[in-house]
């Protein structure tokens, strides 16, 4: 069908355009729903271990010595490692729900996993003759210990704010603040534990070696892949 216009002809189709399909929300995605249910079931099965590890972790928010004591107890340290691994996926789901990064869920999980493995590898390669092995393990595992607290806090933040229909931008800011405080606290605890065996200058060098490469790799991955 043609219609005259002063500057020419405009062709109009007789067929109506199909309406654009609405974008699938996070909760409507079946993969997210299945993973959330799986995480909930796993958390319910491991509630006893959560209660066991929570007691030694709470004092670590105020002091560094409980983190060292945690390394002396093999059963607690293994429980810590297992729970930190189990909480990794719920944390990624919470970050993905809030749109914390432009990365999709599984890519975000992969980037965070590689970042954690990079820090673990550096802690195993780096020489630490001035720092005892137990203190070194406590310092390098401080972030993984406190990650349990961060993950529970992040999941509760997303769950409660989501239930009250809080704007996603507000939830995102809340998660960023929690992650920033967690990262700062983990660095402070690492510094305190290492500084108990060596001076401030060596502590600073150790922190640079442990923290800068993983942080740089994480930032580069988000900027490049996002």
Range-by-range predicted roles:
Residues 1-38, 89-103:
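Long, highly hydrophobic alpha-helical transmembrane signal-anchor segments
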Residues 27-55:
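Hydrophobic alpha-helical membrane-embedded segments
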Residues 26-37, 79-86, 202-209:
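Alpha-helical transmembrane segments and their helix-start/interface "positive-inside/aromatic belt" motifs
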Residues 50-74:
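Membrane-interface amphipathic/juxtamembrane segments adjacent to transmembrane helices
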Residues 39, 80-98, 114, 118, ...:
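Hydrophobic alpha-helical transmembrane segments of multi-pass integral membrane proteins
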């Amino acid at each position: 069908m043609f219609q005259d216009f002063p500057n020419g002809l405009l062709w109009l189709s007789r067929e109506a355009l199909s309406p654009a399909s609405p974008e699938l929300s996070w909760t409507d995605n079946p993969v997210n729903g299945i993973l959330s249910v799986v995480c909930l079931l796993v958390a319910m099965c491991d509630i006893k271990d959560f209660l066991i590890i929570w007691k030694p972790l709470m004092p670590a928010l105020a002091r560094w010595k409980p983190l060292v004591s945690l390394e002396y107890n093999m059963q607690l340290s293994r429980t810590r490692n297992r729970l930190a691994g189990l909480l990794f996926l719920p944390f990624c789901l919470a970050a993905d729900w809030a749109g914390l990064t432009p990365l999709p869920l599984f890519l975000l999980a992969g980037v965070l996993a590689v970042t954690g493995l990079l820090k673990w590898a550096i802690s195993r390669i780096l020489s630490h003759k001035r720092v005892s092995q137990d203190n070194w393990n406590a310092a390098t595992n401080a972030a993984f210990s406190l990650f349990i607290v961060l993950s529970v806090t992040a999941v509760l933040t997303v769950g409660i704010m989501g239930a009250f229909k809080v704007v996603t931008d507000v939830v995102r800011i809340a998660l960023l603040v929690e992650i920033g405080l967690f990262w700062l606290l983990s660095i402070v605890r690492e510094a305190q534990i290492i500084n108990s065996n060596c001076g401030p200058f060596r502590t600073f060098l150790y922190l640079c070696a442990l923290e800068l490469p993983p942080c740089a790799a994480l930032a580069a991955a988000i900027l490049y892949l996002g």
